[in-house]
Every structure is written in C-alpha cells, then in structure tokens.
Amino acid sequence: MASTVRQRTVRVNGVDLSLREAGDPGAPLVVLAHGFPETGHSWRHQMLPLAAAGWHVVAPDQRGYGNSSAPREVSAYGTDELSADLLGLAELLGHERAVYVGHDWGALLLWDLCRMHPDRVTAGVAASVAFADWPAPPLDIMARRYGDRFFYINYFQRPHEAETELGRDVADTMAKVLWGASAGAQADPMFFTRDELPPMEGTGFLTGRAQPPALPWPWLDEEEFRTYVDEFSVSGFFGPVSWYRNMNANYERTRHRPVAAMTMPVHFVTGELDPVNLTNPAFDSSMRATLPGYRGSTVIAGAGHWVQQEKPAEFNAALLGFLSSL
C-alpha cells in the first residue's frame, strides 16, 4: 500500500474533499494541511516517505481549493468549519486523534486545532507560520499598522477585487506567487516595511512582481506547475481569499481557549529565506516561552516559503525525525 499515491473524494462536514492518500489505512494517521495558494499537490514529496515510515497519510485539497467543494459564503471558511473538515476526515478514516502537519494557512489551522481541540491532536508540525497569540483582532492590528499603504492581507478583505485579479490569468498568478516567495527570488514587495510599501489605492496583489524565469525551476517542473494551474482553474480564488476574511472571526473563536492546554508535542520548520519569518526573527524564543509542548524548530538552509517543496529531503528528515521521537 505504501508504494502508490491514491486519489479519491470523500464527504465530510457537508463538503466534498478531494484527497491524496498513501500508506496502510490501518496505520497511525497523519493529515497534511496545505496553505495559500496551494493544494494537496504541495505535499507530493512527503506522501511516500511518510507511508514508507509506517504512516497512513492523507493530503486533502482543503475547502475552496482544487477539486474540493467551494462554498460561496465567506463565513464557510472560518476556523470552526475548517477544523471540522480535518477532524471529520480523521473520524471518517477511523481515528479520533491524529498527527497534523500544516504549511502556511495549514499551519494557522494546525495551531487552532491544537488550541480548540487539544484532545484530538496527537502531535503537530507547523511549517512557515509560527504560533501567535494575538492581543487584539488581527485585521484591526494590520489595518492600523499599514494604514493607507498596501498590505496583501488588508487587500484581500476587499470583496470581489482580490479574487478577480488572481483569477484573471491563473498561470501568471501562480508563477509570480510561487516564484516570488521562493528562495530563488529577490525579496517580495508584499513583505517590505511599511514605508517601502506602495499606496493601497491602485495596487494589486500582483503589482510590481518580477516576471519569473522560465520553468523548470530547481524545485518545480512544468508538469508540477500545470497541476496547480489546472486545480486553481477549477476552484478559482474566492475560497482561498475567504480564509483571510475570517481572521477576526477566528480570533473571537479562539481567544478564550487557554494556550496552556496546548500540551501536545509540536515542532516548527521554516526555510532560512522564508520572507514570513525574515520579518519574525523571534519566532523560536516566542514559541519556546508560550507553548507547553514546544519541541524546537528546524531552519532549512536555502529554502524559501515553500519549504516542503523547495527542500523536500531536508524537510522530510526534520518531519520524520520528529515523528520518530513521539
């Protein structure tokens, strides 16, 4: 069973989730949760190594992405529904508890799972986005911080505008976003300091992004890229940007849940050149002081934001090393 990746669609929590699956269905379960803008395809380098190590591994296209259901209500993308999707998937596969691995938005969802449902998470690995216990609604903080300057999360709050821009030319969008946050690119404009950012008015998510080099890249070939384009051509971008539109609602759902209950073992992995953590250099010390079950971090040299794709061997070594310690 460990030698192939299987694909199927399951009905969970009122939505259809398309998933990739490998390993023995009777083995311990690990659920891989992708981020923005990705799908279960982003875990292609992890599926078989995890299965070979004795895990039953599933990587769903999360709601709004790829070939999974994409509800048209913004509220359908709150962390309560997203968490119920993953917990329901585990239950469907016969598991009350599972190991969860999340990248980018998948990492944010992992942190919420650990905080809201600590009894359902055996252990967790977060990639690229560290745990943060926001002191106030995060969208309010970002609105004050950036004011009239462009910041992509604030831009994503604008109804219709962001998803229309991103969906206009899916291949161009995916190429610029995937290249722009990788180690091979120069610093992406959306991560500059406030004074260096352009004005919000008249600026889009793709404005000013460099034209990527022709494929293949060291970590992504033409066929792998085309899979992303095909999947986002199906789903569009309303669902993906709607995850961002729930950030304040997610804060309200989680803020009274004690961080002290997050006692499950957790590990953090990031790329040395990930622009998210270049702006958050204290991520390790902050989590070490905050999370009871924190087991340290792995910083992977030469990797950008797409760490599990850019440096799969190094990422897998960190992931499997952590799992073997459980």
Residue ranges of each PLM-predicted region?
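Glycine-rich phosphate-binding loop signature in dinucleotide/nucleotide-binding domains
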Residues: D24-P25, L93-E96, L326
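Flexible "cap/lid" subdomain of the alpha/beta-hydrolase fold that forms the substrate-access gate
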Residues: S3-V5, D16-L17, Y65-R97, V101, ...
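Catalytic active-site module of serine/aspartate enzymes centered on a nucleophile-bearing elbow/loop
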Residues: Y294-L326
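Conserved HGGG/HGGXW glycine-rich cap/lid loop of the alpha/beta-hydrolase fold
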Residues: V15-S69
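Signature tryptophan residues that serve as conserved aromatic anchors
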Residues: F36, G40-W43, W55, W105, ...
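Short acidic-hydrophobic surface loop/beta-edge motif
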Residues: R6-V12
